[in-house]
Every structure is written in structure tokens, then in C-alpha cells.
Amino acid sequence: MSNTLFDDIFQVSEVDPGRYNKVCRIEAASTTQDQCKLTLDINVELFPVAAQDSLTVTIASSLNLEDTPANDSSATRSWRPPQAGDRSLADDYDYVMYGTAYKFEEVSKDLIAVYYSFGGLLMRLEGNYRNLNNLKQENAYLLIRR
């Protein structure tokens, strides 16, 4: 699927409830890539997470199941509520957020970090630039399932 920009499985190593009532910051490491790490603010009232949980994390440019045409820019698309019986990528996941990539940072020679904001809930994804090269400074969907 060309709508999928990033997809990996992460093992949660730490859950920090911090000072917010319904939000925790989780730290997770990829089970398939040595240097890929995830830090994510998550609403634990909607999606409870514990240490040692295994999560599939996907970043997608669209929730359409079929590939989006290359000339289909965000200016020409319109949002409409899904019709009864319509399926989307979100149907296969337990927790979905929509946000924007706002910062890219070079961590070391081969590592970069990409920062996203999902309405104030933040995410930092660090990994090899070859694995994160599809991520651009644009809006995207974050999809998570157990």
C-alpha cells in the first residue's frame, strides 16, 4: 500500500503517567530494527498501555484502503463522514490519531528523529534515515493495534 509511510512492531519499555490525568508518555523499542525508538503521548483512558505490551504502529498518509492517485493533492480532496459499510484502514486498528510532522532532527550520521503533534499529544520516532525516508513534513494518521 502506498498510503503506508511507516510500519513496525514496538515493545513498550516504560509507561510514565507524568502529571496528566488521562495521558501517559510511553517509551518503546522496535522488535525488528535495532536503532528504532518511539516516544509517544497516548490517551490511556481510550487505549490503556502497560510495560511489555507489543504494539503495531503504522503511519499513513490516508485511511483509504486503495492507493491514492499521485495527483490527488490535499487541496482537491474533501472530507466526508464514512457511509455505512465503507471500510477504511482505521477499521483494522484500535487507536487512531491525526496530526502533523513538525520537526526533523539529525541524531547521528545514520539516525534521524521525526516529531509529530496530534492535537497536543506528541510523538518522537527515531530510526535509520533509510527506514524513515517516506516521512515528510505533512499531515498523517497514526494507527496503533495490539
From Swiss-Prot:
Keywords, in A-Z order: Acetylation, DNA-binding, DNA-directed RNA polymerase, Nucleus, Phosphoprotein, Ribosome biogenesis, Transcription
Residue positions where Phosphothreonine is found in the record: T68
Residue ranges, annotated region (Non-specific ssDNA binding): 16-39
Entry-annotated residues carrying N-acetylserine: S2
Entry-linked Gene3D superfamilies: Nucleic acid-binding proteins (2.40.50.140)
GO BP, one annotated term: transcription by RNA polymerase III
Subunit structure: Component of the RNA polymerase I (Pol I), RNA polymerase II (Pol II) and RNA polymerase III (Pol III) complexes. Component of the RNA polymerase I (Pol I) complex consisting of 14 subunits: RPA135, RPA190, RPC40, RPA14, RPB5, RPO26, RPA43, RPB8, RPA12, RPB10, RPC19, RPC10, RPA49 and RPA34. The complex is composed of a horseshoe-shaped core containing ten subunits (RPA135, RPA190, RPB5, RPO26, RPB8, RPB10, RPC10, RPA12, RPC19 and RPC40) where RPA135 and RPA190 form the DNA-binding cleft.
Note from the entry: Present with 6210 molecules/cell in log phase SD medium.
Known role: DNA-dependent RNA polymerases catalyze the transcription. of DNA into RNA using the four ribonucleoside triphosphates as substrates. Common component of RNA polymerases I, II and III which synthesize ribosomal RNA precursors, mRNA precursors and many functional non-coding RNAs, and small RNAs, such as 5S rRNA and tRNAs, respectively.
Protein name in UniProt: DNA-directed RNA polymerases I, II, and III subunit RPABC3
Organism: Saccharomyces cerevisiae (strain ATCC 204508 / S288c)
